[in-house]
Amino acid sequence: MKTNIFFIFLISILNQIYALFNNSYYSNLEQECIKNILNCTQSKTLSLLEPIDQAPIPKSDIISRLLYHTPYISRRDQVLIDEDFLETFYLLYNNPNQLHTLLSLIKDSESGHNWLGFLNNFERCLSDNTLLTCRDNVCKSYSYEKLKFTGNIFVENIIGFEFNIPSNMINFNMSILIYLENEETRTQRIVRIDHHGINVFDALLNCLRYFSRYYNFSFPLIQEMEKYNEVLPFRSEFSNLLIRTY
């Protein structure tokens, strides 16, 4: 079962989505829970990591850990100059956001089947794992180990998610869709990055739950995600029986 969820229609509320994902308010906090937190911390007000109505300030030198990758060996020993190569080249050429774009393309689930796999192989050969970017004849080098990675996936330009439950119902797989653009060459592409784990889905659902409750209205997206949540692996009710496992 595969579900595509796109947040293009949420552009007008994107600031709230950014903020909610980053601080404790995205969780579905009941009044009793908030009261307990205040009693525990002896605080009169909740202290948020970020203002609820403001998005984080994007920084080009901070990269989502979603784009972190381990260089792998590619079997390609040559690069074919074809349409795919040229499209990717134009996407990178003089791109103001070249580093993020390059890492996104390498991490793309399709990169192992094209010339970017060769590029990844070449990177593995460098002893210091150096990345180079060039724009307007000005080149910069980056040490891969010294790049600033953050757990926040929304520092990248995410436009959608794909959720997939396999037939065996023991794994949860999802893909995160990132929109890449180069205004210099007027080229665009959507890359698909595989993500294993249910944490992003939970955070996303809790974010929408809060938004729905805060503004006191429901919408089809959250209804579909709630239905989807019910059939996810390990979401059945806990048993009251003690079962021996040996």
Swiss-Prot record:
<dbReference type="GO" id="GO:0019064">
    <property type="term" value="P:fusion of virus membrane with host plasma membrane"/>
</dbReference>
<dbReference type="GO" id="GO:0019031">
    <property type="term" value="C:viral envelope"/>
</dbReference>
<keyword id="KW-1169">Fusion of virus membrane with host cell membrane</keyword>
<comment type="subunit">
    <text>Interacts with glycoprotein H (gH); this interaction is necessary for the correct processing and cell surface expression of gH.</text>
</comment>
<keyword id="KW-1168">Fusion of virus membrane with host membrane</keyword>
<dbReference type="GO" id="GO:0055036">
    <property type="term" value="C:virion membrane"/>
</dbReference>
<keyword id="KW-0732">Signal</keyword>
<keyword id="KW-1040">Host Golgi apparatus</keyword>
<dbReference type="GO" id="GO:0020002">
    <property type="term" value="C:host cell plasma membrane"/>
</dbReference>
<keyword id="KW-0261">Viral envelope protein</keyword>
<feature type="disulfide bond">
    <location>
        <begin position="134"/>
        <end position="139"/>
    </location>
</feature>
<keyword id="KW-0472">Membrane</keyword>
<dbReference type="GO" id="GO:0044177">
    <property type="term" value="C:host cell Golgi apparatus"/>
</dbReference>
<dbReference type="GO" id="GO:0016020">
    <property type="term" value="C:membrane"/>
</dbReference>
<keyword id="KW-1032">Host cell membrane</keyword>
<dbReference type="GO" id="GO:0046718">
    <property type="term" value="P:symbiont entry into host cell"/>
</dbReference>
<keyword id="KW-1162">Viral penetration into host cytoplasm</keyword>
<keyword id="KW-1015">Disulfide bond</keyword>
<comment type="similarity">
    <text>Belongs to the herpesviridae glycoprotein L (gL) family. Betaherpesvirinae gL subfamily.</text>
</comment>
<keyword id="KW-1043">Host membrane</keyword>
<dbReference type="InterPro" id="IPR002689">
    <property type="entry name" value="Cytomegalo_gL"/>
</dbReference>
<feature type="domain" description="gL betaherpesvirus-type">
    <location>
        <begin position="29"/>
        <end position="235"/>
    </location>
</feature>
<feature type="signal peptide">
    <location>
        <begin position="1"/>
        <end position="19"/>
    </location>
</feature>
<dbReference type="Pfam" id="PF01801">
    <property type="entry name" value="Cytomega_gL"/>
</dbReference>
<keyword id="KW-0946">Virion</keyword>
<comment type="function">
    <text>The heterodimer glycoprotein H-glycoprotein L is required for the fusion of viral and plasma membranes leading to virus entry into the host cell. Acts as a functional inhibitor of gH and maintains gH in an inhibited form. Upon binding to host integrins, gL dissociates from gH leading to activation of the viral fusion glycoproteins gB and gH.</text>
</comment>
<keyword id="KW-1160">Virus entry into host cell</keyword>
<protein>
    <recommendedName>
        <fullName>Envelope glycoprotein L</fullName>
    </recommendedName>
</protein>
<keyword id="KW-0325">Glycoprotein</keyword>
